[in-house]
């Protein structure tokens, strides 16, 4: 694995390049929301690689609320993200655990919705998401966390598609923070394509 770029800006630029090359596609697609789009972003090729996880962990950790004790997100897209951020926090000597929110309660054992070390009721949790379109996945995670007694006021995403997700999250009293907008990733993909 190559070492991280020396500055935060270089790290951010490298992450944008990785997303543009490995996560972004142009064509005709049906999104998880059911919407049709000419742009598709699948962050998993980046978020499931060691070097991508390292970049994402550092980039996302910067936007986790200072008093948050956990990061959480809906399985599957958020699974590597919460782990990467918890690891980056540990390396920065910050205690921050990871929780995975199931799409439905476990059908056996404890019938749990949440996996991971559960903090006490009332604890602040920051929700992580790979891509926000309508905000539906984030809202499902937030609903489960709030029903369990946790304080959730912020969602941090890698890419905001700017298709109503921020407005839906704001309506649920959530702040959306994004590393990149879809147009930034698409533009970088075009730039990289013309360079080759």
Curated annotation (Swiss-Prot):
InterPro entries the UniProt entry points to: OPRT (IPR023031), Or_phspho_trans_dom (IPR004467), PRibTrfase_dom (IPR000836), PRTase-like (IPR029057)
Transmembrane segments: none
Record field: catalytic activity: orotidine 5'-phosphate + diphosphate = orotate + 5-phospho-alpha-D-ribose 1-diphosphate
EC supergroup of this enzyme: transferase
Biochemical pathway: Pyrimidine metabolism; UMP biosynthesis via de novo pathway; UMP from orotate: step 1/2
Nucleotidyltransferase recorded as keyword: no
Binding site for orotate: 133, 161
Cofactor: Mg(2+)
Keyword Transmembrane included in the entry's annotation: no
Disulfide bonds: none
Organism superkingdom: Bacteria
Gene Ontology MF: a single term: magnesium ion binding
Stated family: Belongs to the purine/pyrimidine phosphoribosyltransferase family. PyrE subfamily.
PANTHER family with a match to the protein in the record: OROTATE PHOSPHORIBOSYLTRANSFERASE, URIDINE 5'-MONOPHOSPHATE SYNTHASE
Function: Catalyzes the transfer of a ribosyl phosphate group from 5-phosphoribose 1-diphosphate to orotate, leading to the formation of orotidine monophosphate (OMP).
Protein name (record): Orotate phosphoribosyltransferase
Gene: pyrE
């Amino acid at each position: 694995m190559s070492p991280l770029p020396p500055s935060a800006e270089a790290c951010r630029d490298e992450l944008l390049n990785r997303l543009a090359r490995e996560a972004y596609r142009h064509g005709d697609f049906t999104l998880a929301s059911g919407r049709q789009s000419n742009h598709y972003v699948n962050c998993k090729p980046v978020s499931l690689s060691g070097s991508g996880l390292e970049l994402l962990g550092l980039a996302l950790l910067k936007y986790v609320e200072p008093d948050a004790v956990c990061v959480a997100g809906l399985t599957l897209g958020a699974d590597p993200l919460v782990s990467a951020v918890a690891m980056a926090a540990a390396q920065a000597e910050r205690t921050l655990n990871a929780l995975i929110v199931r799409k439905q309660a476990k059908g056996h054992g404890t019938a749990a919705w949440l996996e991971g070390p559960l903090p006490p009721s009332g604890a602040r949790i920051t929700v992580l998401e790979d891509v926000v379109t309508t905000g539906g996945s984030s809202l499902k995670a937030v609903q489960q966390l709030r029903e369990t007694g946790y304080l959730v006021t912020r969602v941090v995403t890698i890419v905001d598609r700017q298709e109503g997700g921020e407005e839906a999250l704001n309506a649920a009293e959530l702040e959306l923070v994004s590393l990149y907008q879809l147009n930034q990733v698409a533009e970088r993909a075009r730039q990289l394509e013309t360079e080759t």
